[in-house]
């Protein structure tokens, strides 16, 4: 798989790094670790929203060399939960994120996949937290999906599963898997270790802004690594063919 993004000695004050790594096309990479590990700081840096020490190459060019307009064409970024910036119909908010605004069938498909069919006419300031999260997810998917944006390369998601129920999480997993199969690189933070063990291709385990381990999910999410990150003991079990992590006292 080709390298989409290369990080070299990336650091920000005392919150992050220095750390290095690469993001590959067609893979799902999870950032895991305790609160304050630096996951959100790292995602914002990878999105080009902040600057600091070290270097990031995106599609072979320095990240800081990308204009905001060009960057929005090649990568999409979901930050942590935000309140709606202003009131507008959901369909209008989603349309603003589409590069090809004639693709109404794609908008309807993505909205349907996230159970937003009956919310398209509702104002964004009348949504519950979970509904707004799904609208924001639909927006970044519409922005970056290769179906309508052949230039799309990278999707960055900060705790995308927040406020989603089990069925909605499953629906999002299907969407992300489909995007991955179309060649998109996906990087997301997660607090659900078992979800990472099932759905990620690779993982970066962070603590205190440092990278404790990186590599294949099963090689990173080991009881010794997790004990070092979280300060508690873990066991990894195989239950009916599924691997599962549990904490132990």
From Swiss-Prot:
Domain ABC transporter: 1-233
EC nos: 7.6.2.8
SUPFAM superfamilies named among the record's database cross-references: P-loop containing nucleoside triphosphate hydrolases
GO cellular component, as recorded: plasma membrane
Substrates-to-products reaction catalysed: an R-cob(III)alamin(out) + ATP + H2O = an R-cob(III)alamin(in) + ADP + phosphate + H(+)
Organism: Escherichia coli O157:H7
Top-level taxon of the source organism: Bacteria
Major localization class: membrane
UniProt-annotated binding residues for ATP: 33-40
Quaternary structure note: The complex is composed of two ATP-binding proteins (BtuD), two transmembrane proteins (BtuC) and a solute-binding protein (BtuF).
Keywords, ordered alphabetically: ATP-binding, Cell inner membrane, Cell membrane, Membrane, Nucleotide-binding, Translocase, Transport
Keyword Acetylation: no
Bilayer topology: Peripheral membrane protein
Signal peptide start and end residues: none
Pfam families assigned: ABC_tran
Highest classification ranks of the organism: Bacteria, Pseudomonadati, Pseudomonadota, Gammaproteobacteria, Enterobacterales
Protein's recorded name: Vitamin B12 import ATP-binding protein BtuD
Record carries keyword Translocase: yes
